[in-house]
Design a protein with these regions (language model features):
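Conserved AMP-binding/adenylation subdomain of ANL enzymes
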Residues: 218-235, 243-283, 298
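Gly/Ser/Thr-rich phosphate-binding loop
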Residues: 279-287, 296-378, 415, 419
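Conserved pre-ATP/AMP-binding loop-to-beta segment of ANL
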Residues: 47, 158, 179-199, 206, ...
Length: 598
């Protein structure tokens, strides 16, 4: 354990103070934007590696030069400040150079999800009305599936690879000067100008484009730099998508603004993770909770005890994974946090309390007005009292987390920048909450807060279903299921059953070889009440995730438990024999016909 890590663990207060000190000038609008700051970083850190992957490395000087060239490319195309360019590229050092350069010229860059194709990709392009779409050569076949659904006025430009008839931006910039831009040549964008569109994950419905200002980019970068105490000696391992705020801004920006290096990987590999960490001498790792579970499921590897990681930072680390992950791999510090790209507030667990997503120190309470309000699952809305106002939750009572928006009724609050679609932005705002005229951002997440002020994630709104007259939390059921012997991963959701009120619980399981279904049920009987125990079980080889490692439970729920539609092994709980039995077509017909009671 390094002295710096030990200091962080002993005094979370120091982490908060560092974060406040680094972001104070940004709040006063006394700093440049990140693409402008890159030039100053290049002067200071020069040949030090900024971004690297398996084949390419960009020093700070080389990164700044490319930023200048991409900015000049934007000017050469007569792209005006506020116009949009979409970016459709896999993780690589040039990804950052492209969007930093274009935003240096005042262009807004929309970071497209590289898992999308066809009409879904076209939707993401069309909702931001771009002039150009920059496509990596390796992704051109995927991009062409959307082109017929995009207006002909939108120009496609290739980056690398076989471009066919398309111009290649990476060869065009070679002819452009790499020297520092002057204010006359290219006026710098303001902090409050929009820099990026970052899309919601699309776990339900089509993605929405969230507005991300230069101010937000700088705040995220410097706030996390303070909490993680990043230094020039740090090397961040970033295998999360660069099109998302966590992988693309937090993991990269927090290290770059302090002179460290970012080791990029196109995708996460549980098998290659520890050898990679050791070989690249990484000190930091940006995680999504599911990645930690995948690592725990791997057999022991010699490199898992040879690493030099001092801190892992991320979100979504489940309570049942936290301590086994930290203990097995000897992780000195875990910085778990809660945030949303478009959200008005964030929570941080600087103390490393297992299972908690964060807390708000008393000295910051006035800056971060957050509340948990009683929520009506049936109506899908917060509960209102006789005066029409929302009701705060008691200690350890689950409710929807909301954050007050700045400027509302003269109160302090967080900045809510919303989406490209104004109507979508309005849907996220809850009005007349505790006083007439106030406005709060709706997270859509149910949380509880304990007596010490720690927040705990409970469920997504809509992930609670009703069965046998009782409300069932998918989060609580998932926590019970994933601790059962032989279960590697699980998704829990509700499914409709003809003739039954509410929705029955169903669990999709990834299991180890030799999984004992009877023993699984016995464990659930001990841990869950009858109404919360999954009625249906589906054994799957893997769980499909979004590009940001969120479960696609909506697709599983739509597929349901019909053996003619689902090829995986399906089981239904037979209360008479007290066992999960195979659900075949004959049993399904009896169930649908009302002859098989649940």
């Amino acid at each position: 354990m390094t002295a710096r890590t030990d200091e962080n663990m002993k005094s979370p207060l120091q982490a908060w103070v560092r974060a406040l000190e680094l972001t104070a000038p940004i709040e006063r609008r006394a700093t440049p934007t990140l693409p402008v700051l890159i030039e100053a970083l290049a002067e200071r850190f020069g040949a030090a590696p900024a971004l690297l992957d398996r084949v390419t490395s960009l020093s700070y000087r080389e990164l700044a030069d490319k930023v200048n060239q991409y900015a000049r490319w934007a000017r050469a195309q007569a792209l005006a400040p506020g116009e949009v360019v979409c970016l459709y590229m896999p993780n690589c050092p040039d990804y950052l150079a492209v969007w930093l350069g274009l935003t240096r010229a005042g262009v807004i860059v929309a970071l497209l999800n590289t898992n999308l194709t066809g009409t879904a990709l076209a939707h993401s392009i069309n909702i931001v009305s771009p002039r150009y779409v920059i496509v990596a050569g390796v992704l051109l076949p995927a991009a062409w599936t959307a082109r017929a659904h995009v207006p002909g006025s939108v120009r496609f430009v290739a980056h690398g690879g076989e471009a066919g008839d398309l111009p290649r931006i990476d060869t065009q910039i070679v002819e452009l000067a790499a020297t520092q831009l002057t204010a006359d040549e290219c006026p710098a964008p303001a902090l409050d100008d929009r820099a990026l569109y970052i899309y919601t994950s699309g776990t339900t419905g089509l993605p929405k484009a969230a507005n991300v200002s230069h101010l937000r980019v700088m705040q995220w970068s410097h706030w996390f730099a303070g909490l993680m105490n990043t230094q020039p000696s740090d090397r961040m391992y970033d295998c999360l998508p660069l099109y998302h705020s966590v992988g693309g801004v937090v993991a990269t920006g927090a290290v770059l603004v302090r002179g460290g290096s970012v080791v990029l990987r196109e995708k996460f590999s549980a098998r290659e993770f520890w050898p990679d960490i050791v070989q690249e001498r990484c000190s930091l790792f940006q995680y999504i909770g599911e990645l930690c579970r995948y690592l725990l499921a791997q057999p022991p590897h010699p490199d898992e005890s040879r690493h030099t990681l001092r801190l892992c930072c991320g979100n979504g680390l489940r309570p049942d994974v936290w301590e086994p992950f930290q203990q097995r791999f000897h992780i000195p510090q875990i910085l778990e946090y809660y945030a949303a790209t478009e959200g008005s507030f964030s929570l941080y667990n600087c103390e490393g309390k297992p299972g908690a997503i964060g807390r708000i120190p008393p000295f910051l309470a006035h800056r971060t007005p957050v509340a948990l309000v009683k929520f009506d699952d049936a109506q899908g809305q917060p509960v209102r009292d006789e005066a029409g106002l929302c009701i705060r939750c008691a200690v350890n009572e689950a409710g929807e987390a909301i954050g007050q928006i700045s400027g509302a009724a003269g109160k302090h609050g967080g900045r809510f920048e919303g989406y490209a679609d104004a109507a979508a932005s309005e849907k996220k705002i809850l009005r007349d909450v505790f006083a007439k005229g106030d406005a709060w951002y709706r997270t859509g997440d149910l949380m509880r807060k304990d007596a010490q002020g720690y927040f705990y994630f409970v469920d997504r709104v809509g992930d609670t279903y009703r069965w046998k007259g009782e409300n069932v939390s998918t989060g609580e059921v998932t926590a019970a299921v994933t601790t059962c012997a032989g279960v590697v991963d699980a998704a829990v959701y509700g499914v409709s059953v003809p003739g039954a009120d509410g929705r029955a619980g169903m669990a999709a399981l990834v299991v180890e070889s030799g999984f004992d279904l009877a023993a699984f049920r016995r464990e659930l009987v001990e841990r869950l009440p009858d109404y919360a125990r999954p009625v249906f079980v589906r054994v799957v080889p893997t769980l499909e995730l979004t590009g940001t490692f969120k479960l696609r439970k909506q697709d599983l729920a739509l597929e349901g438990y019909d053996p003619t539609r689902v090829r995986d092994a399906l089981y239904v709980e037979d209360r008479r024999t007290e066992a999960y039995v195979r659900l075949e077509e004959s049993g399904y017909a009896r169930l649908i016909g009302g002859q098989l009671r649940l």
